[in-house]
């Protein structure tokens, strides 16, 4: 049974989130607190397995509380954030401080949105409960997701079984979820500006990916930006898929460009790693390197298999270094992986691939 605590200064939000946890056979609500100081008193009685945390609260802000939790008893924390530019920036800082995931505050009175919010909340809690927080590489720097139906990536992109044109450009595709913001920062900050162009899907709600890309851009030698439709993939550039849209790689003559598409959730996500990887298999073939990293579920496993079958080098982050060994595990089970590597070694694999 996953014991959950909610820390939010809004009584309405606490009530709505609490109601979303009712009747879940594997989740129990340990309690709610209106600010971090009340939360710490609550935790004296019993410590939760997962904490749902607001950022802006009286008496102690969420990031200060988060750092205190991580110092005293590292615990999976899911940030419950507002959809504002300022909220996004602070939320990304919270991820850097050790939080494992983001959910957006539910829009009250909108039944469809509440149902979507509940699905995302439960998914985040179950993933967080499996997270090995001690494995986070924390540097200490400071559209609603539609529900459920598990679509095949064919609903977003056409079949990839046709002949590949040749091009000399190299492309690196990275896919990750829970724990991935820390892992991506760890890898990308180790890469020189001369590295091959990189396309990334990190499971994250829309409105947050721009702030995440901006943060990475401030600490990486490579340029990092949120992808825009028709952006060219170039050496020295990292394109982060927008939250709420699928990102595909396409060939345009001798160039690679990205296309952003709406569409249903694929493998329960949008953006989907499967959609990106399958498009990379189609567009780049053996000129690509695919890396599936920490995260829960199976998104990306089939797409990595198609990359493998098209001659790409395919890597999976190993279990010992994953915060959640889910997506890499499923890819290994499918036979999609050339080899498993530790997080410490992923950057050098990308550098070696660039020099080939």
From Swiss-Prot:
Protein name: Protein-glutamate methylesterase/protein-glutamine glutaminase 3
Record's comment describing the protein's domains: Contains a C-terminal catalytic domain, and an N-terminal region which modulates catalytic activity.
Residue numbers carrying 4-aspartylphosphate: 54
Post-translational modification: Phosphorylated by CheA. Phosphorylation of the N-terminal regulatory domain activates the methylesterase activity.
Organism listed in the record: Shewanella oneidensis (strain ATCC 700550 / JCM 31522 / CIP 106686 / LMG 19005 / NCIMB 14063 / MR-1)
Location of the Response regulatory domain: 3-120
Catalyzed reactions: [protein]-L-glutamate 5-O-methyl ester + H2O = L-glutamyl-[protein] + methanol + H(+); L-glutaminyl-[protein] + H2O = L-glutamyl-[protein] + NH4(+)
Keywords: Chemotaxis, Cytoplasm, Hydrolase, Phosphoprotein
Gene: cheB3
Family, per entry: Belongs to the CheB family.
Annotated Gene3D superfamilies: 3.40.50.2300, Methylesterase CheB, C-terminal domain
Residue ranges of domain CheB-type methylesterase in the record: 165-356
EC number: 3.1.1.61, 3.5.1.44
């Amino acid at each position: 049974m996953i014991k959950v605590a909610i820390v939010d200064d809004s009584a309405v939000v606490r009530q709505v989130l609490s109601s979303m946890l009712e009747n879940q056979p594997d989740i129990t609500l340990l309690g709610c607190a209106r600010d971090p100081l009340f939360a710490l008193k609550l935790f004296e009685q019993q410590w939760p397995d997962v904490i749902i945390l607001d950022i802006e609260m009286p008496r102690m802000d969420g990031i200060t509380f988060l750092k205190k939790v991580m110092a005293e008893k590292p615990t999976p924390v899911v940030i419950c954030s507002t959809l504002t530019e300022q909220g996004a920036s602070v939320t990304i800082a919270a991820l850097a401080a050790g939080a494992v995931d983001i959910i957006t505050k539910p829009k009250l009175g909108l039944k469809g949105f509440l149902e979507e919010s509940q699905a995302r909340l439960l998914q985040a809690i179950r993933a967080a409960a499996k997270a090995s927080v001690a494995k986070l590489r924390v540097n200490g720097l400071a559209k609603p997701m539609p529900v459920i139906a598990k679509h095949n990536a064919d609903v977003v992109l056409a079949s990839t079984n046709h002949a590949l044109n040749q091009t000399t450009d190299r492309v690196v595709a990275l896919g990750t979820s829970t724990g991935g913001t820390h892992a991506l920062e760890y890898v990308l900050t180790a890469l020189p500006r001369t590295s091959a162009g990189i396309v990334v899907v990190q499971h994250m709600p829309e409105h947050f990916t721009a702030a995440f890309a901006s943060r990475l851009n401030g600490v990486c030698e490579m340029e990092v930006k949120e992808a825009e439709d028709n952006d060219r993939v170039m050496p020295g550039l990292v394109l982060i898929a927008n939250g709420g849209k699928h990102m595909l790689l396409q060939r345009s003559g001798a160039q690679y460009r990205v296309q952003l598409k709406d569409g249903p959730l694929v493998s329960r996500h949008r953006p989907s790693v499967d959609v990106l990887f399958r498009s990379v298999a189609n567009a780049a073939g053996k000129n690509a390197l695919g890396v599936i990293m920490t995260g829960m579920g199976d998104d990306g496993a089939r797409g990595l298999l198609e990359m493998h079958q098209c001659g790409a080098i395919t890597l999976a982050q190993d279990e010992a270094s994953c915060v959640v060994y889910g997506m890499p595990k499923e890819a290994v089970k499918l036979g999609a992986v050339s080899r498993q590597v530790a997080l410490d070694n992923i950057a050098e694999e990308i550098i070696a691939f660039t020099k080939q």
